[in-house]
């Protein structure tokens, strides 16, 4: 089953959200 792909997607989303938050903090 696709548990691994799901967790990788979750981690990617979390990383992108963190990046967006960092960028907003810079602005």
Curated annotation (Swiss-Prot):
Keywords: Amidation, Hormone, Secreted. Its main location: secreted. The modification Valine amide is found at residue 27. The keyword Secreted applies. GO terms for biological process: adenylate cyclase-activating G protein-coupled receptor signaling pathway; diet induced thermogenesis; hippocampus development; intracellular water homeostasis; negative regulation of gastrin-induced gastric acid secretion; positive regulation of lipid catabolic process; positive regulation of pancreatic juice secretion; positive regulation of somatostatin secretion. Pfam families: Hormone_2. InterPro entries: Glucagon_GIP_secretin_VIP, Prosecretin. One of its GO terms (cellular component) is extracellular space. Hormone involved in different processes, such as regulation of the pH of the duodenal content, food intake and water homeostasis. Exerts its biological effects by binding to secretin receptor (SCTR), a G-protein coupled receptor expressed in the basolateral domain of several cells. Acts as a key gastrointestinal hormone by regulating the pH of the duodenal content. This is Secretin. It comes from Ovis aries. The gene is SCT.
């Amino acid at each position: 089953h696709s548990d691994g792909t799901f967790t990788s997607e979750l981690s990617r989303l979390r990383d992108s959200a963190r990046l967006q938050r960092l960028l907003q903090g810079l602005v």
